[in-house]
C-alpha cells in the first residue's frame, strides 16, 4: 500500500518514531533536519520509483509508524521546515543512530574504501552514562556453531571465533570463524552483528538492566572472549551502526546548551544547513 503525503507531514510522524519526543528541543530539531535530509536524498535518488514510492516505512529508510504527531516533535519539524544538511550545495546522507560507544564511525564500517567527505569519526563522551553505552552478553557455543552452518553453509564443529580486523574508530569489521572443515571471514558491520546475534540470550546494560537479545548485536564495537565448546562473551558499547549523529549524544549536548546547528556540525564535517524550495 502506498501512502502519499507532504514531506513535512511525513516528518511529523517520522521524528517521534525515531527519537523520543521527551528529548531536548535542539536535539529534536537536529533529528528533524537529519530525517528531512535523509528523505530528500532518497527522493532524489528514486530507489523505490518503480513502486511509485520515495521511501518505505522500515529501518531500511526511516521508521514511519503513522502515529499521532507529538507536540514537541511537530514543533521541531515546523521550526526547521525545509532545512537540510548539504555539502557543496548537495544533500548528504545524514545518518544517525541511537547511542555511541564513546566514538562515532564513518561509512568505512560498511566497506567504503574512502569515507564520504561529510562523515567523520569523533569522540562522543556526551552519552557515556547512557545504559547502552556499555553492555555484555554471552552466546552459547552451539548457537554460533548452528549459525555458522545456517548462514555460511559451514560444516563440522566450530573451533574458534576471533576479531580479525577493526577500523580506525575501533569497530569490528572482520570476524574470523574457524571450523574443522575450513575457515571463513564475516565482514561489514551488519553481517557481523547478525552472525553474533544475541537472540535467545540476555544482554546486561551499563546500569545492570537485563534485556532480551534481538536479531542484531547492539553494535560492532565489542571485545570477544571465547570459551571453545562452551560460549563466547561479548563486551561492548553503543547501540546502532555508529555512523553520523548519536541521538542520545545529541540530547545530552542540547541539555548542555548546544544548538541544533552546533550539534550537527559536531557530528558531520564541512556541512551547511540550506533551505529547500519546498
Go through each PLM region and give its residues:
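Conserved, single-site charged/polar hotspot
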Residues: 1-278
Amino acid at each position: 500500500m502506498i501512502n502519499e503525503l507532504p514531506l513535512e507531514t511525513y516528518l511529523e510522524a517520522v521524528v517521534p518514531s525515531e527519537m523520543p519526543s521527551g528529548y531536548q528541543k535542539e536535539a529534536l530539531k537536529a533529528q528533524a533536519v537529519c530525517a528531512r535530509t535523509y528523505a530528500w536524498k532518497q527522493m532524489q535518488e528514486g530507489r523505490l520509483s518503480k513502486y511509485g514510492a520515495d521511501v518505505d516505512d522500515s529501518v531500511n529508510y526511516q521508521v514511519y509508524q503513522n502515529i499521532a504527531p507529538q507536540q514537541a516533535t511537530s514543533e521541531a519539524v515546523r521550526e526547521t521546515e525545509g532545512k537540510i544538511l548539504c555539502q557543496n550545495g548537495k544533500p548528504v546522507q545524514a545518518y544517525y543512530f541511537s547511542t555511541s560507544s564513546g566514538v562515532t564511525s564513518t561509512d568505512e564500517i560498511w566497506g567504503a574504501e574512502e569515507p564520504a567527505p561529510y562523515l567523520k569519526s569523533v569522540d562522543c563522551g556526551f552519552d557515556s552514562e547512557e545504559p547502552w553505552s556499555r553492555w555484555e552478553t554471552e552466546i552459547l557455543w552451539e548457537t554460533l556453531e548452528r549459525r555458522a552452518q545456517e548462514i555460511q553453509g559451514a560444516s563440522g564443529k566450530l573451533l574458534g571465533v576471533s576479531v580479525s580486523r577493526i577500523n580506525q574508530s575501533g569497530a569490528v569489521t572482520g570476524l574470523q570463524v574457524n571450523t574443522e572443515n575450513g575457515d571463513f571471514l564475516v565482514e561489514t558491520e551488519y553481517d557481523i552483528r547478525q552472525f553474533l546475534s544475541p537472540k535467545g540470550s540476555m544482554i546486561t546494560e551499563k546500569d545492570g538492566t537485563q534485556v532480551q537479545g534481538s536479531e542484531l548485536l547492539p553494535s560492532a564495537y565489542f571485545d570477544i572472549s571465547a570459551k571453545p565448546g562452551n560460549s563466547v562473551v561479548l563486551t561492548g558499547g553503543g547501540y546502532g551502526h555508529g555512523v553520523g549523529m548519536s541521538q542520545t549524544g545529541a540530547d545530552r549536548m542540547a541539555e548542555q546548551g548546544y544548538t541544533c546547528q552546533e550539534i550537527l556540525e559536531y557530528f558531520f564535517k564541512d556541512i551547511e544547513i540550506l533551505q529547500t524550495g519546498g
